[in-house]
Amino acid sequence: VDDQKQQARSDAEEGTVRLFITSKSNNKEYVEKRVAEMMVQDTGDIGWNDEEDYKSLILEHHMAASRFGFSELYMPLSNSKKFDTSLREGSIPELSILSKLVFPLLVAYQSGNDFEVAKIIRKNSPLLNKEVFITGLNNQVELLRKAEEAVELLMKLWNDGKVPTCLEVLKSIRDTGLFKVGNRVDEVLADYSQDENEKITALRTALSAPFYELERYALYVSDNTRFATHQGVKGLEFPRVMVILDDAQARGFLFSYEKLFGVKAQSDTDEKNAHDGKDTSITRTARLFYVACTRAKKSLAIVAYTENEEMVRDTALANGWFLENEIYIV
């Protein structure tokens, strides 16, 4: 892609690479599942059957949110532009309380692990704060009862197969004092006000999402899903990699796979920058494409969503990036 030839190690295992080209309007979940199935057929590697055994590289975090099912939580915070770093890192306080305290408590409670429930409460609940507990020597039974009652009230939100919103969970722990939630939670839980801070509005909208979206978001930001960004895996390698090229969903302007594959023409800015020897969206995209594709140790599937499948195919062949038998139109 960048006119540099890469020399494989003499002892390297021969890998498999495939380019799957599909219309940008196709169902992405279906396409990517079908691609994984086709990789099993072409490689004989059943690791492609298990979503946990291959890495899917996407351009932007919101593409993972839509695929992994936490868009309702993620998009209001992303669109507000007020939480960029903390959203990526998983360090927004209201979300951290839910992911680091409530989620482990829920797992322990629902699995009947009373020891772990007690451990989480003793370590994190102000109701059983060491200082409070010691000064309340004559009232320790009451403190324990209050903590147990707070846990039961929280867990009732999941009774009868119900799924509470993140707001409902926050309200419960604030009202009972089970965990310390911070002053901003009061504003988030209050009714909307026209003169309120934009952050509060975005948080309230995001936290109206069902709690399972918080669980999925927490898994994603802790790198416990198959998704990662093209930029975020530099220097890392994985046995099986699916690189997803989807300009329409990415919404950015710095990179363009449609330009790289000849579907869209260069912009005037691209042409001027190329003439001046500066970076263009094509050179930036070529470098990013190289980084993403070289993350695979055994097999690589590239899924290109496009408005012109034939052009992508012809460009890939004309440039010698892929052989004819390595390309599928899905």
Which residues make up each language-model segment?
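The feature marks helicase ATPase cores and/or their adjacent C-terminal helical subdomains
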Residues: 1-330
